[in-house]
């Protein structure tokens, strides 16, 4: 197992092992040239993750576990989408959503329409556009996020 060391203007010096590196065969929309990303959890039991581009560590995304906030949100992948991610019924999967938190905001905006789905076994991931009628911009008060995050640490 190797250790990756990189410097990110937002996070400083980062050390991570290869288990945290994911390949995005098509990149992400708007960032198709970036194929390798580092996924790190904000802190233990936090619903937040950071997805940092390895080749351009100044580019990163904030992700969240939607199940921690929205009980009725479900990601259902088509057979084609499952094939692109090499998924079977036994494959461990993590589904996260991109979040935007405007400066001095009282709410954050979650993209529920296009989750980022990670195949934890093969270390590949893709942003998938769901057929379900979920919004691209779903606001959630930061107070609710803090309440749920605090509940996860108890």
From Swiss-Prot:
Cellular component terms per the entry's GO annotation: cytoplasm
Major site of localization recorded for this protein: cytoplasm
Cellular compartment(s): Cytoplasm
Assigned protein family: Belongs to the FliW family.
Name of the protein: Flagellar assembly factor FliW
Record carries keyword Chaperone: yes
Family annotation (Pfam families): FliW (PF02623)
Signal peptide: none
Subunit structure: Interacts with translational regulator CsrA and flagellin(s).
Organism encoding this protein: Carboxydothermus hydrogenoformans (strain ATCC BAA-161 / DSM 6008 / Z-2901)
